[in-house]
């Protein structure tokens, strides 16, 4: 399985459009798509404006260039807007998407809930990417990765650190701390091992020092080689 080396999330309209434009420009420059664009409903939709945001994502997906590599991050399966996201977006433009990202997955039961919803919406063959964001989810990573619909596991670093209630300092989210703090490093290893055991793709977490190209290079190198 081959996926682009980066998945770029954006949820604000102007940034979503800019991301799609940048993807097209870099695809032309390098002759291949070097990053996916994931249109974000979870963090992108304003409270109370979830339906309107879902319509916007649907419209942007349907009007994107045919060669664009697009995905959508929907709300978690226990969020009131999850089924609206599935119905309004995946039920109408799933053929234009490469995958759907399901955040805050805690168990195989969450994966099954998402799978049933996608199937009922007609997105029968759309792969699932899941975000592992809690200690309990890390504990169940092998079971989650074994699900046949799951294509990739991603590590939700910030929510994972937050879930520890101060046991992991903020430095654990930095480009150095995320590779040295025992609890964070253990989570990364569990996710990677679960993916390798099941033939899935492990995806590294965010790098907050995005303006530091050397920091990004160091993080990407460590993630791919260690």
Segments from the language model and where they lie:
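Expand to "…catalyze enediolate/carbanion chemistry for C-C bond making/breaking, isomerization
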Residues: 1-226
